[in-house]
């Protein structure tokens, strides 16, 4: 009898799953197909083809895919190779507390599949739950003064390292990374800063005092270590994360994922001090063969006069973790990170770590998330970049390094525990 098993059936999205098929004919060719319906009703699909061993088994931890959406030994390939049925759709989790993503995995006889359409019922199937929050994590809506967001607290009395989580130009409130960080032991504040509730849809300036209030709010919490907070930032959020690290003594560890070393778009203001954005070169915006916009050439930080717009990163006292995808088509993130590191070196600083991933794109998400290489954002068809397999490897490695970095620099005396 053919059986399809998965362990665990219900897990956090950053946890691997062991999938195995048994009871097959020795050396039978089979196809594993996965599907997921997101919160908007959009479908995502993946497939991979395998040959059973002499015992009639296919163990995805050891077997090599011979075709489909990936080839080789990739135990979690069915997850990170999911592709949207509707082009330019990004998989986003909004409701992290109440509903997991459900991934259906079905097993077919490969000979019965013609033109990628299933010709008969699956030989076996199962449904997996992929959660963005662990049991016991609490979510507290934040509406204190100007602050808008959601605070996620791990189970237990604490104390916990505190982290502020910042996304980019999409706006609104994205909680999935903060909820996962809380599931891994961090008190995590998912902080909105535009296009959410009563916050401006398109702010004219970035007010750094707002983020200072967020840092103080987190440090005041009785379950949070009071020695300093961390920041995890991506894209547009990176320019804010950098400024926080420079100007706020409360920030002691900053993760910068695919961002710039200068403000862009709008000025930054802090206690009356104005930092103007680097002008962009609109003529350098390009469109690729698929009609997707590529923005990574639009900021020229080596041009005459550009240095006045760069952040004085050498003034920061905390630690930096730069994470860059070398295949990023939205921001020239590797060049910007290397330029920032060059500033630090020239000032005798060694408070930085660089993780640079060949083949990874702009949207480096938690492990096993599907690559989104392009999507429609604010009516723009943007090319984010990335290649499926190296991007997946980057996500898995970076997530571990982010947690290690934050624990090392946010938990007092953690070095004595290593």
UniProtKB/Swiss-Prot annotation:
Cell location: Cytoplasm, Cytosol; Peroxisome
Main location: cytoplasm
UniProt-listed Gene3D superfamilies: Acyl-CoA thioester hydrolase/BAAT N-terminal domain, alpha/beta hydrolase
Outcome recorded upon mutating residue 84 to T: In FHCA3; uncertain significance
One BP term from GO: bile acid biosynthetic process
Variant or mutagenesis effect after changing residue 69 to V: In FHCA3; uncertain significance; contrary to wild-type, undetectable expression in hepatocytes
Any one GO MF annotation of this record: long-chain fatty acyl-CoA hydrolase activity
Xref: InterPro entries: AB_hydrolase_fold, Acyl-CoA_thioEstase_long-chain, BAAT_C, Thio_Ohase/aa_AcTrfase, Thio_Ohase/BAAT_N
This enzyme's EC code(s): 2.3.1.65, 3.1.2.27, 3.1.2.2
Tissue expression notes: Expressed in the gallbladder mucosa and pancreas. Expressed in hepatocytes (at protein level).
List of catalytic residues: 235 (charge relay system), 328 (charge relay system), 362 (charge relay system)
Consequence when changing residue 372 to A: Retains N-acyltransferase activity
Keywords: Acyltransferase, Cytoplasm, Disease variant, Fatty acid metabolism, Hydrolase, Lipid metabolism, Peroxisome, Phosphoprotein, Serine esterase, Transferase
Modified residue annotations for Phosphoserine: 125, 416
Gene Ontology cellular component annotations, sorted alphabetically: cytosol; intracellular membrane-bounded organelle; peroxisomal matrix; peroxisome
Pfam entry (one): Bile_Hydr_Trans
Effect on the protein upon substituting residue 328 to A: Abolishes N-acyltransferase activity
Superkingdom of the source species: Eukaryota
Catalytic activity: choloyl-CoA + glycine = glycocholate + CoA + H(+); hexadecanoyl-CoA + H2O = hexadecanoate + CoA + H(+); choloyl-CoA + H2O = cholate + CoA + H(+); chenodeoxycholoyl-CoA + H2O = chenodeoxycholate + CoA + H(+)
PANTHER family per UniProt: ACYL-COENZYME A THIOESTERASE-RELATED (PTHR10824), BILE ACID-COA:AMINO ACID N-ACYLTRANSFERASE (PTHR10824:SF18)
Record disease entry: Hypercholanemia, familial 3: An autosomal recessive metabolic disorder characterized by reduced biliary secretion of conjugated bile acids, fat malabsorption, and fat-soluble vitamin deficiency. Clinical manifestations include rickets with variable growth failure due to vitamin D deficiency, and coagulopathy due to deficiency of vitamin K-dependent clotting factors. Additional variable features include pruritis, anemia, hepatomegaly, and bile duct proliferation on liver biopsy. Laboratory studies show abnormally increased levels of unconjugated bile acids.
Job description of the protein: Catalyzes the amidation of bile acids (BAs) with the amino acids taurine and glycine. More than 95% of the BAs are N-acyl amidates with glycine and taurine. Amidation of BAs in the liver with glycine or taurine prior to their excretion into bile is an important biochemical event in bile acid metabolism. This conjugation (or amidation) plays several important biological roles in that it promotes the secretion of BAs and cholesterol into bile and increases the detergent properties of BAs in the intestine, which facilitates lipid and vitamin absorption.
Family designation: Belongs to the C/M/P thioester hydrolase family.
Quaternary data: Monomer.
Protein name as catalogued: Bile acid-CoA:amino acid N-acyltransferase
């Amino acid at each position: 009898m053919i059986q399809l098993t998965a362990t665990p059936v219900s897990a956090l999205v950053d946890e691997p799953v062991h999938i195995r098929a048994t009871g097959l004919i020795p050396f039978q060719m089979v196809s594993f197909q996965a599907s997921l319906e997101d919160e908007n009703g959009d479908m995502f699909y993946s497939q991979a083809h395998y040959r059973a061993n002499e015992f009639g088994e296919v163990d995805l931890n050891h077997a090599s895919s011979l075709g489909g959406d990936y080839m080789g030994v990739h135990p979690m390939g069915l997850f990170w190779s999911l592709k949207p049925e509707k082009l330019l759709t990004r998989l986003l989790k909004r409701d992290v507390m109440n509903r997991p993503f459900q991934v259906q995995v079905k097993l077919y006889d490969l000979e019965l599949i013609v033109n990628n359409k299933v010709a008969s019922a699956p030989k076996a199937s199962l449904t997996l739950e992929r959660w963005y929050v662990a049991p016991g994590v609490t979510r507290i809506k934040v509406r204190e003064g100007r602050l808008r967001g959601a605070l996620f607290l791990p189970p237990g009395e604490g104390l916990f390292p505190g982290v502020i989580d910042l996304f980019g130009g999409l706006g609104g409130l994205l909680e999935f990374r903060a909820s996962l960080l809380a599931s891994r032991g961090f008190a995590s504040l998912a902080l909105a800063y535009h296009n959410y509730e009563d916050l401006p849809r398109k702010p004219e300036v970035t007010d750094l005092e707002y983020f200072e209030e967020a840092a103080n709010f987190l440090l005041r919490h009785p379950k949070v270590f009071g020695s300093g907070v961390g920041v995890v930032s991506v894209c547009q959020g990176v320019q804010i994360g950098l400024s926080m690290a420079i100007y706020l003594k409360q920030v002691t560890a900053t993760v910068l994922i695919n961002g710039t070393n200068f403000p862009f778009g709008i000025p930054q203001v802090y206690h009356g001090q104005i930092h103007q954005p680097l002008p962009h070169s609109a003529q350098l915006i390009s469109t690729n063969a698929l009609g997707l916009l590529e923005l990574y050439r639009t900021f020229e930080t080596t041009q005459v006069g550009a240095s006045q717009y760069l952040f004085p990163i050498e003034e920061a006292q905390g630690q930096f973790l730069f994470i860059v995808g070398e295949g990023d088509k939205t921001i020239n993130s590797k060049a910007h990170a290397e330029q920032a590191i060059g500033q630090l070196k020239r000032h005798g600083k060694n408070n930085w770590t660089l993780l640079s991933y060949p083949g990874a794109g702009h949207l480096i998400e938690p492990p096993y998330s599907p690559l989104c290489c392009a999507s429609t954002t604010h009516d723009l068809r943007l090319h984010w970049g990335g290649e499926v397999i190296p991007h997946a490897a980057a996500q898995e490695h970076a997530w571990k390094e982010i947690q290690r970095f934050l624990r090392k620099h946010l938990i007092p005396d953690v070095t004595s525990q290593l």
